[in-house]
Amino acid sequence: MNKTEKALLQLTGRALFGTPADFEPSAVDWSALYHEASNQALSLLIWDTLSDEERGSVPDDVGIRWEQDSFRHIMNNEQLLYEQEQVIQLLTAASIPCVILKGSSSAANYPQPSLRIMGDIDLLVRPEQQMEAVKALQANGYGDVLDEKHHCHMTLHKDEIAVEVHKEPNGLFLDGNSEILGRIRNYFSDAIDRRQFMDGLPVPSDEHQAIILILHKLEHFTTSGLGLRQLCDWAVFVEKKDG
């Protein structure tokens, strides 16, 4: 592990849990740290936790890009949260209950939820209502399904916003006849009935959320690789539930 990675981990720990960071700001390659934080989808979280001394050590050109990038993420988060609320209201009116997967569901466990960068909107509905939910969205401005044959979700776009309508969580890459897959699907059969609300947001029960996070990590581990943000999602979930 190099100095940049160590500094990034220490800053992440401070942002999430208040643990002290032990490094000399002037010795950090801030350009490399910014790029790595961006690659890990943590640039907003890290920029917010920097002290005045640390920001003063960031080269001007890097600091300008980082600050602009952070502002862009804040605006994108707000836009997604607004659209998410509209989608939830739309599905509720159509008698299609749902829960939020990942995204703001995971962000709710962060000390400052607004600092978790969002990418899209992931909704879990009952399998038998997946197409009904898709049609409800299409009747309200969303386009054609891009991945109709995907094993667990259908993705629709409206302008630059993507909504994934799931019939089951990510990470279930097992053979359709697998006994394990059958057990996992059976485990999630009551996910909608057992949903809870956090600040009005429908989210999975703690037990379901734990398995969803693990399955999501499994998917990343076996495909694109496990990132720091996935570890952060798990760490803050465990910290909040243990606390």
For the regions a language model picked out, list residue spans one by one.
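Conserved NTP-donor binding/palm subdomain of two-metal-ion nucleotidyltransferases/polymerases, i.e.
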Residues: M1-G119, V125-G243
